[in-house]
C-alpha cells in the first residue's frame, strides 16, 4: 500500500472466520508456555500495549481492555445495586476482579480458573491489568475445574461473571457454554442475583454463535438481555449476556446510575457510566432478529465450538 510502513517483524494472525484474519504486530514476546490446557503468549504489541493470547486468540490488551472489562462487570453489579458476594469463572488476567473491587459493598470475590500457569504469568507480566487485585483480602483464588467446584459448593452468590475463553474445540472452555453449566450457575445464584456471560462477537458473519448462546441461556433463566461493546483489539464488537430470574431494567435513567456509581464505588471509570450503560443495553436490530429466530440449545452432548485459533508468523 502506497505510503504505508509495516514496522513489526512478528505477527499474530487470528482467524475470525474461515475467510478473515485479524493481525497484530508484535514487538516483544514477554512469556510463552504450553500448559496442560492451552498455548499462551504474553506479548507487547505495536499499537495495543501488552496482550494475552490463548490458543492464538487475543484475550485482552492493556490499551483497550478497560472497555471489555467495564462492560462485562458493571451492568450486573449496577442491576443488583448492593452486590456483596461475586463469583468469577475464568478471568486469568485479574482485570475482572479489579473492576469488581471498585465497589465498596463487596465482601468476597471468588475467582476460579482452571489454568494456574496462565494466572501466574499474568500476575508477573500484566500488573497494569490486575493492579494487585489478587492481593486484596476479599479475593479467594481457586485453581480448579469450575464444573467440579460448582457440583460441590454450598456457597451462593449475588453476582456470577463467566469470563471464559472462547469455546474452541481444542481449548478448555467449550463445556462451560452449555445448558448444564448455566444450570449449575443458577443453583448457586442468590434470589435477585445476576449472571453475566461473555458471549462472543456480534459481527453479522458471527452473530449466530452469539444468538445460540443467548438461546441456551434462555433455556435456564427467565430473563436474558444481549449487550455489546466496541473492542478494537478484537477487530469487532463483543457480545455479553446479562441473565436473571429477576427483572432486568433495559432503560435505566443515566443520572440515577451515575449517582449509584458515585455512592457505592471508588470511581475511575473510562467506559461505563449512566449514558454508556443505557447505550449498550440497546441491542441492535440484526442481533435481536438473530436471537428471535434461534432455537439451538447447547448441551454437553452437543457443545458449542467456535471457529478457529491463530498463528504466529
Task: Go through the PLM ranges and name each one.
Residues 2-13, 60-194, 204-214, 311-313:
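The AdoMet/dcAdoMet-binding core of the Class I SAM-like
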Residues 88, 196-198, 226:
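Short catalytic-loop micro-motif centered on adjacent basic/acidic residues
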Residues 165, 198-202, 229:
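Short strand-turn motif at the edge of the Rossmann-like AdoMet-binding core
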Residues 182-183, 208-231, 241:
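Conserved Class I S-adenosyl-L-methionine
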Residues 53-54:
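A general beta-strand register signal
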Residues 2-49, 226-313:
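Soluble small-group transferase modules, centered on the S-adenosyl donor enzyme superfamily
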Amino acid at each position: 500500500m502506497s505510503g504505508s510502513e509495516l514496522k513489526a517483524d512478528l505477527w499474530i494472525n487470528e482467524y475470525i472466520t474461515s475467510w478473515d484474519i485479524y493481525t497484530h504486530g508484535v514487538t516483544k514476546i514477554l512469556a510463552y508456555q504450553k500448559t496442560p490446557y492451552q498455548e499462551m503468549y504474553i506479548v507487547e504489541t505495536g499499537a495495543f500495549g501488552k496482550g494475552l493470547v490463548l490458543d492464538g486468540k487475543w484475550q485482552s490488551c492493556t490499551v483497550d481492555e478497560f472497555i471489555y472489562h467495564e462492560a462485562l462487570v458493571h451492568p450486573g453489579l449496577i442491576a443488583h445495586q448492593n452486590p456483596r458476594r461475586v463469583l468469577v469463572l475464568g478471568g486469568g488476567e485479574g482485570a475482572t476482579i479489579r473492576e469488581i473491587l471498585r465497589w465498596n459493598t463487596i465482601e468476597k470475590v471468588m475467582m476460579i480458573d482452571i489454568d494456574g500457569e496462565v494466572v501466574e504469568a499474568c500476575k508477573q507480566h500484566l500488573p497494569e491489568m490486575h493492579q494487585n487485585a489478587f492481593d486484596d483480602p476479599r479475593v479467594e483464588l481457586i485453581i480448579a475445574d469450575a464444573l467440579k467446584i460448582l457440583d460441590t459448593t454450598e456457597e451462593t452468590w449475588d453476582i456470577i461473571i463467566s469470563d471464559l475463553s472462547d469455546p474452541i474445540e481444542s481449548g478448555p472452555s467449550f463445556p462451560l457454554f452449555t445448558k448444564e453449566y448455566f444450570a449449575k450457575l443458577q443453583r448457586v445464584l442468590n434470589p435477585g442475583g445476576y449472571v453475566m456471560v461473555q458471549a462472543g462477537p456480534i459481527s453479522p458473519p458471527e452473530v449466530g454463535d452469539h444468538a445460540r448462546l443467548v438461546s441456551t441461556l434462555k433455556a435456564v433463566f427467565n430473563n436474558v438481555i444481549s449487550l455489546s461493546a466496541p473492542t478494537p483489539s478484537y477487530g469487532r464488537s463483543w457480545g455479553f449476556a446479562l441473565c436473571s430470574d429477576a427483572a432486568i431494567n433495559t432503560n435505566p435513567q443515566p443520572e440515577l446510575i451515575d449517582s449509584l456509581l458515585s455512592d457505592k464505588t471508588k470511581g475511575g471509570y473510562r467506559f461505563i457510566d449512566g449514558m454508556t450503560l443505557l447505550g449498550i443495553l440497546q441491542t441492535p436490530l440484526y442481533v435481536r432478529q438473530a436471537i428471535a429466530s434461534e432455537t439451538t440449545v447447547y448441551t454437553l452432548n452437543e457443545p458449542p465450538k467456535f471457529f478457529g485459533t491463530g498463528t504466529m508468523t
